[in-house]
Amino acid sequence: MFETNYLAGGRLDPPFHPTKTEPFIPGFIMDSFSFQTNETTYTLPADMELYAISVSASIYELDDKWSLIVNGQTVCQDIYTKRIPEGMHFMVYKAVAAGSTITFRFHNQGILDKTVWFELHFLR
């Protein structure tokens, strides 16, 4: 027997389905220096839901990796770069309040300085 637990025309519960509807994708560029860890911090201007990140670099070296930290909680830890730009979609929509901080950290393990681009994908 099949039983419906949601009203027709209703919505599914978060965090697996969003509560916000408008896309907002800020882009960032940063320099990353040889054998250093560099980071950029973004403060949210409004309540939003984070659902993905896109990362690209001017040069890819074997041990380069990145991390994403939301309000001190690590969401992505030591993700090694690939030879192409990448996007990572989360399995949930992470609610993040206005004034919260999101830190992108790039660990340049190579001998070359590089430029790193990343975008944070939100709904607001």
Ranges and model annotations:
Residues 1-124:
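Beta-strand-centric surfaces of beta-sandwich/beta-rich domains
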